[in-house]
Amino acid sequence: MVESQCMLGPAKGKDFDDSIVLGPVIVTRDELDNPYNLRMQARINGETWCDNNSNTIHWKFSDMIAHISKSETLYPGEVIGSGTVGLGCGLEHLRFLNDGDIVELEVEKIGVISNKVIRR
């Protein structure tokens, strides 16, 4: 997969039914002064697992859009997932989610989303 060769991860292999969560708030580009300088945190059951900044991303949003547009048609209003913030993957820390865990993701100037892990 070309995404893996470009350090994009298995991008097209990460989206499954019911796997994408949005909200409670989304913002448009004009609402953020600088999307490349936002504090981002991940907490599991109240414990901080990741505290980083959007300035650690490998690819700018314009680069991601250009890459996706090579093989797919994008329409106004579509949402593009940009991946995991630096050091935000549990595998990097040898820590994994369990059934019942509460995952909170927070992005400065946007808000917090909280979800419970449910094993199917």
Residue positions per predicted region:
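Catalytic-pocket segment enriched in acidic/His residues
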Residues: 2-120
